[in-house]
Amino acid sequence: MSPTIIDHEAQIADVLLRQIFAYWQEKAAGRGALPARADIDPVDLAAVLPAVSLIEVRRDVMGRPGRLRYRVMGGFHVEIMGRDATGELLDLGAGESDAAAQAIATGRPIYAERTFYPANGTVLTFGTLMCPLATDGRKVDMLICAVAPHYKANDLPVGRVNRFARAALETVARR
């Protein structure tokens, strides 16, 4: 699925990503501007924190976005990638960054479905939500990137992602 601009929670099937989108929307409401990183409190996202990563938008001398840097990687991201890439750079324009590029360009949340082929031979499909943040309220300088693995009924892995997902879903269901 190609990256899609998200305007309403109903456009997102996954309960974890819906909760993160609703939180971002709440922080953006009534401001007439994008929320800043300073507006985001990890305590508010405790139930879904394993799904959340923060990505810094690096700009060139002309102010154009060119590279992304993982500031913090959530447990889902670490499990999907098979390593913690905190601090690593990613060139904007690489296939994985389509949703990020669109969120930066539009200043709007973007949803995309991704398929990842880890070295162990399994196939993992997951939803990705990119929510833009801007210190000045306009120019995107950070992204909340949230991922939620999709599992088929009889294809649940026994790894950490599954434990994170179950715990987060149980917490969300209690609310």
Predicted regions and their residues:
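Intrinsically disordered, low-complexity terminal regulatory regions
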Residues: M1-E88, L92-R175
